[in-house]
């Protein structure tokens, strides 16, 4: 076998786009079961409401924090069944990525990477509260991002012009 070296030098890869996950962590988790143990005798099916939010902030040069915030409320005719709040964060290093592609990464790809962990944590928390696991449906982060940017574009186009 010949002694060919297939490793790329640092000079060859320094200009290529690089994205890496530095850390993932629960920043805040709260499970409330305010009507236990009576809630386990209730016969009505609860109505479940899920609210979802994505937040980002720069932490250092080329490092961004992405936060997935999920608020789940389950209510029945008799009262609150359970309430879960989760803030799950990821730290991402983004290097040599064009500026116009950073925001789409932070609002589409980063949440897509974090979502399976959020889903599992919520399912486990609800199950540990003695309820059937809550399995969130997959979320199309690209569609949400496009919808949000379209709404922002429409708002910026309808704002009255400044006075001269």
Curated annotation (Swiss-Prot):
InterPro entries: SecB, SecB-like_sf. Pfam families: SecB (PF02556). One of its GO terms (molecular function) is unfolded protein binding. Transmembrane segments: none annotated. One of its GO terms (biological process) is protein tetramerization. Gene3D superfamilies: SecB-like (3.10.420.10). Keywords: Chaperone, Cytoplasm, Protein transport, Translocation, Transport. One of its GO terms (cellular component) is cytoplasm. It is found in: Cytoplasm. Homotetramer, a dimer of dimers. One homotetramer interacts with 1 SecA dimer. One of the proteins required for the normal export of preproteins out of the cell cytoplasm. It is a molecular chaperone that binds to a subset of precursor proteins, maintaining them in a translocation-competent state. It also specifically binds to its receptor SecA. Belongs to the SecB family. This is Protein-export protein SecB. The gene is secB.
């Amino acid at each position: 076998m010949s002694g060919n070296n297939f490793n790329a030098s640092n000079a060859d890869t320094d200009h290529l786009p690089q994205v890496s996950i530095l850390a993932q962590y629960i920043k805040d988790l709260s499970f409330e079961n305010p009507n236990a143990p009576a809630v386990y005798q209730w016969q009505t099916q609860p109505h479940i409401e899920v609210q979802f939010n994505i937040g980002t902030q720069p932490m250092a040069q080329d490092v961004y924090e992405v936060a997935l915030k999920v608020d789940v409320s389950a209510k029945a005719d008799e009262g609150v069944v359970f309430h879960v709040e989760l803030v799950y964060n990821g730290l991402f290093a983004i290097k040599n990525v064009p500026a116009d592609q950073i925001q789409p990464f932070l609002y589409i790809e980063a949440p897509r990477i974090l979502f399976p962990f959020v889903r599992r944590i919520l399912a486990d928390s609800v199950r540990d509260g003695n309820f059937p696991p809550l399995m969130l449906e997959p979320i199309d982060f690209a569609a949400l991002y496009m919808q949000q940017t379209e709404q922002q574009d429409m708002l910026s186009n309808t704002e009255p012009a400044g006075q001269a």
